[in-house]
């Protein structure tokens, strides 16, 4: 069996975690499977993938020349392509039993509108080549810019299954394909447990980090972003300044009472956010930044590390997913529906701060509430572990149903 996963985002521990868990669970069900990950752009390939995984750089019709080449490929059902990169992609499509849309952010929808067409265009090729495809628990929407909705609708309706990782995305998708079955599960990263023995050994070898954790009775993990990369929030410079001011004061207040602050970069390679976190690191006694570019300390290691912390303050979606998975109380700062939707589904909205409502007092009060409710919060997360894992695995179960159906047809 051969599975192609398209639209994979690299240089991001969150996307890496969701993809790696997907790969691991599919491989458990089908030990003989070959999985090809098509990485968008020229980003770093995911570290520590199993030997049955191959990674390629995905063709994207961005330039005029690439768009012309892609149009020819679609019109000829993939038989003619004047782009070498697209020929590689077409070859992988042809050899695959099914194509999966990688578990990631809302790349289909208004949020990343300027890039969306390069995602949708690949599905035109899949439809022309009569290849089955499935949306493997990404986020999607909103779809208020209606000029593209007929295209979106066509691509969604041609799929074998639409599985989404949050209820808000589900609502958006149902609004434009009301007659199509849409399933809502949980983020793919939940479905595969962390190898604790292997990652404990990695932590033992990471001497500086281990000493820092031992020196502080309680450590708070942090993922932070100034959102200067975001297509909407980057237009308002006040947001970045607000983030800087709020977090500098917050870190100062908690380190004064004995907490250690552990920054956990979510981006690496071309998209490294290590330097941004350095700007918040006031000293080396009470602040520590986990290395970003050492492949040993991958997404699974980050999950294990978060499991050793007292709490997490997360502006990055997957750091909060890691926290929930590992039973570590956390406060999420939500800038897209993916985080808000998860917190609503898990009845954790009291620990979610909308970016528009973020202030010094709100963050301070929410953290104090977490401390007050700590034991109850931690127990709640630990009790929900099996539920979250099972919910996430439903995406793989749906894939299994499709594969069985395809085998029956053959």
Q: Each predicted region: which residue ranges?
A:
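Active-site anion-handling motifs in enzyme catalytic cores
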Residues: 1-410
